[in-house]
From Swiss-Prot:
SUPFAM superfamilies: SIS domain. This is Glucose-6-phosphate isomerase. Coiled coil: none annotated. It catalyses: alpha-D-glucose 6-phosphate = beta-D-fructose 6-phosphate. The gene is pgi. It comes from the Bacteria. It comes from Francisella tularensis subsp. tularensis (strain WY96-3418). It is found in: Cytoplasm. PROSITE patterns: P_GLUCOSE_ISOMERASE_1 (PS00765), P_GLUCOSE_ISOMERASE_2 (PS00174), P_GLUCOSE_ISOMERASE_3 (PS51463). Belongs to the GPI family. Catalyzes the reversible isomerization of glucose-6-phosphate to fructose-6-phosphate.
Amino acid sequence: MLFCDDSKKYLKEQNINLKNEFDKDDKRVEKFSLKHQNIYFDYSKNLINDYILKSLLESAEKSSLKDKIKQMFNGAKINSTEHRAVLHTALRDLSSTPLIVDGQDIRQEVTKEKQRVKELVEKVVSGRWRGFSGKKITDIVNIGIGGSDLGPKMVVRALQPYHCTDLKVHFVSNVDADSLLQALHVVDPETTLFIIASKSFSTEETLLNSISAREWLLDHYEDEKAVANHFVAISSKLDKVKEFGIDLEHCYKMWDWVGGRYSLWSSIGMSIAFAIGYDNFEKLLAGAYSVDKHFKETEFSKNIPVIMALLASYYSCTYNSQSQALLPYDERLCYFVDYLQQADMESNGKSVNIAGETVNYQTGVVLWGGVGTNGQHAFHQLLHQGNIFIPVDFIAIATSHHNYDNHQQALLANCFAQSQALMFGQSYDMVYNELLKSGLNETQAKELAAHKVIPGNRPSTTILLDELSPYSLGVLIALYEHKIFVQGVLWDINSYDQWGVELGKKLGKNILKAMNDDSSDEYQNLDDSTRQLIAKVKNK
């Protein structure tokens, strides 16, 4: 059964008024909220009632979702266009049951690789790993892009209060040299260890940054042997790693069944472990594993990722929602939106179904947002008074790591107030009467009132964590990962390929050749606009 069929459009005719729904049902919050571990999921401020939720759940039951969940966890090749399993969940699976992929028990492989990463982290932290000159390592520079950067960077920042190793961790991703130079300006070549995170060891941005970092190191040492003491790699291309000068003993595995945007649980998370210690890294994995079990074993009506996906898909199909705002009310989650943008938009930004047929319904949305309370002084105006339908996810942390309780209370009060304002708004009469009470005369009040009306009845979900710990962050990330998967199933698309990014890469290589040789075929085949842009650059 296709989720985005015409029947969903009739649900909109329920004409949900959130204020009325709360007034007439004192059990609404109890009915439309869930709890998992230390996370409370309140979806009571969404445009649903019992009938709508029942209809959405029935659609999920009639879909292939149950089978797809089993297939994913059992190692079926649900990434159909690349003929790959999707098993980032295996990286955090604490069970010992064999899991066979292409004739091999990957559980044993994962356990072995985790141990290798743990040993490296402990070796560097303890000082047993030394730089070429014999000095202890003080700085880690992770060179990667996309999933090899966004996930680890987000986690390292989010868990800053858990940093316990005295190692400073830096991230370099953009091909713009400024990204690399920001790191190189603050590190010492004699005490820096670089991580090259690239499955193919040929990603343009990562390779160029790595080559420049290598040159920077050798400018100091003037000895090729120094590379082995200052570089490790995470890649599946051993020949290229060896050619770079990295000891293969210090090359860590990337498997085809782990997509880049779901790779922070793998050796790609090495930079996380360098910051928070391997024990805390394991707690991050354990939190995600608890959600995997919840997702696999919980009926849909109480399954948080399923409810998240049903709501988002419902708004997309029925309200033509093209946008989703994500508002974490915690500065430590300042990179969380960037991370989820890739996870969500690269996964579900598709226009053909699994069979390769063009779909006639909307799939992925633009995910955007920023930390509170900053957003209140920037883009919240659009959320409250704009005429675009934008569902909102609020993320809040009940207790903080610091002792500034007045700050934390103000932060939470603002978060809850924003969700309440989106729900209730304020009518013309309310505004008009308030303006009269403030001292304006009737004419002045009438002139201003229309500009201060806030429609309200705008949907939001609030996710409240007891604390932001390695375990709870693992829970939060995994909830969104599985939400993305469920949406892909409901829309009948492949959430685990990303062919849309390939054309730009290919054209970029052609244009680079054209910029260096205007007699080349690549230059001759350019459009006039691109030729002019190249000419403008060359004339500067």
